[in-house]
Amino acid sequence: MHDAELVLKCWGGVEADFEGTGGEVLTRLFKQHPETQKLFPKFVGIASNELAGNAAVKAHGATVLKKLGELLKARGDHAAILKPLATTHANTHKIALNNFRLITEVLVKVMAEKAGLDAGGQSALRRVMDVVIGDIDTYYKEIGFAG
């Protein structure tokens, strides 16, 4: 079974609450790695204790998870999805690759807790994200961004 399939087995729980789960992912990312909150200008002024209930954080978290869902459902054939995302994250947002690694670990933990992603699924999600991050790195190099 393809790694994406293992993760998608639990994806229904994520889709049922994109905002709640996405808000949890970003809230944990920002609390565990406060430097990442500074990468989102609209979230800079939000106090740590106000992140979880913030509508904008939840909405952006939902956007992140919906894009991840597209990538998973593409089952590795994701160039058309990933190249524009990599381009904006390089040229507009200036997001270094390590930040994708940080959010991967948060995603793994939140999906384990909220969607029942088991140990095999967690390993599969890490492998999927390793491929995605490797491809982002390739696109970054193509456009001259030292991410």
UniProtKB/Swiss-Prot annotation:
Recorded coiled-coil stretches: none
Q: Name one GO molecular function term.
A: peroxidase activity
Annotated InterPro entries: Globin, Globin-like_sf, Myoglobin
What Pfam families does the entry give?
Globin
Alphabetical keyword list: Cytoplasm, Heme, Iron, Metal-binding, Muscle protein, Oxidoreductase, Oxygen transport, Transport
Reaction catalysis annotation: Fe(III)-heme b-[protein] + nitric oxide + H2O = Fe(II)-heme b-[protein] + nitrite + 2 H(+); H2O2 + AH2 = A + 2 H2O
Keyword Metal-binding part of the UniProt annotation: yes
* GO BP term, example: removal of superoxide radicals
- Which superkingdom is the protein from? Eukaryota
Instruction: Enumerate the subcellular locations listed in this protein's record, separating them with semicolons.
Output: Cytoplasm, Sarcoplasm
Q: Where does nitrite bind?
A: H60
> EC no.?
1.7.-.-, 1.11.1.-
Residue positions binding heme b? H89
Q: Which amino acid positions bind O2, per UniProt?
A: H60
Domain Globin as annotated: residue spans = 2-141
| GO CC field | extracellular exosome; sarcoplasm
Any transmembrane segments, and where? none
Presence of keyword Protease: no
What family, per the record? Belongs to the globin family.
Output this protein's name. Answer: Myoglobin
- Species per Swiss-Prot/TrEMBL record: Cyprinus carpio (Common carp)
- Which gene is annotated as encoding this protein in its UniProt record? mb
